[in-house]
């Protein structure tokens, strides 16, 4: 039995609230249960120096957590003068995931930066960030089309992510903190809506997992991501 009473394949209640902030071209409050992340997509009419003159755009991301997003206060990374390794790993994952969903040549020499700020953490902050960032990115691109900065949509499709793991000997989907902290295996999966995988990150925390357990977790991830992408589509249709 899971702490929340969910079935093995059941994701948490997911909410995607668009236009959550006033100034960004795309903004979303994404909620996976008690995990809440604000994702804002900002458009700039320039690209990194190494891309100038190449006719391609760029999509990047930054990630951070409020000090009291967790049970006890964490010191702001800005106060220590540098980002932690976990933060850098997560924001690179978010950026890679979003770039996989965009035709950078069709974007032209423009850059979109997606900021993912965790305001409350209960497991799965990176997967929630990717899911919300995809919707914020879609809104930013639609804004670019509406304002004449793009002639066509460079997005190849929706991208979403979910965590899976082995908890109490069972493969489960979308782990909350109580499950994540006690899981034998923890894995994050990022997929496009056509089912193609962008990233699979998996680690045996307490005990090695079998090939069959890997297949079971990937099957749960695909089912969960299919459900999440339907929620993305519904949010963008509103």
UniProtKB/Swiss-Prot annotation:
Catalyzed reactions: tRNA(n+1) + phosphate = tRNA(n) + a ribonucleoside 5'-diphosphate
UniProt xrefs under InterPro entries: ExoRNase_PH_dom1 (IPR001247), ExoRNase_PH_dom2 (IPR015847), ExoRNase_PH_dom2_sf (IPR036345), PNPase/RNase_PH_dom_sf (IPR027408), Ribosomal_Su5_D2-typ_SF (IPR020568), RNase_PH (IPR050080), RNase_PH_bac-type (IPR002381), RNase_PH_CS (IPR018336)
Residues involved in phosphate binding: 86, 124-126
Principal EC category: transferase
One Pfam family linked to the record: RNase_PH_C
Organism superkingdom: Bacteria
GO molecular function: 3'-5'-RNA exonuclease activity; tRNA binding; tRNA nucleotidyltransferase activity
GO BP of this protein: rRNA catabolic process; rRNA processing; tRNA processing
Keywords from the UniProt entry: Nucleotidyltransferase, RNA-binding, rRNA processing, Transferase, tRNA processing, tRNA-binding
Documented EC number(s): 2.7.7.56
Gene3D superfamilies on file: GHMP Kinase, N-terminal domain
HAMAP family the record matches: RNase_PH
Matching PANTHER family: EXOSOME COMPLEX COMPONENT, EXOSOME COMPLEX COMPONENT RRP41
Family of the protein in this entry: Belongs to the RNase PH family.
Subunit structure: Homohexameric ring arranged as a trimer of dimers.
Task of the protein: Phosphorolytic 3'-5' exoribonuclease that plays an important role in tRNA 3'-end maturation. Removes nucleotide residues following the 3'-CCA terminus of tRNAs; can also add nucleotides to the ends of RNA molecules by using nucleoside diphosphates as substrates, but this may not be physiologically important. Probably plays a role in initiation of 16S rRNA degradation (leading to ribosome degradation) during starvation.
Official protein name in the record: Ribonuclease PH
Organism: Aliivibrio fischeri (strain MJ11) (Vibrio fischeri)
Recorded name of the encoding gene: rph
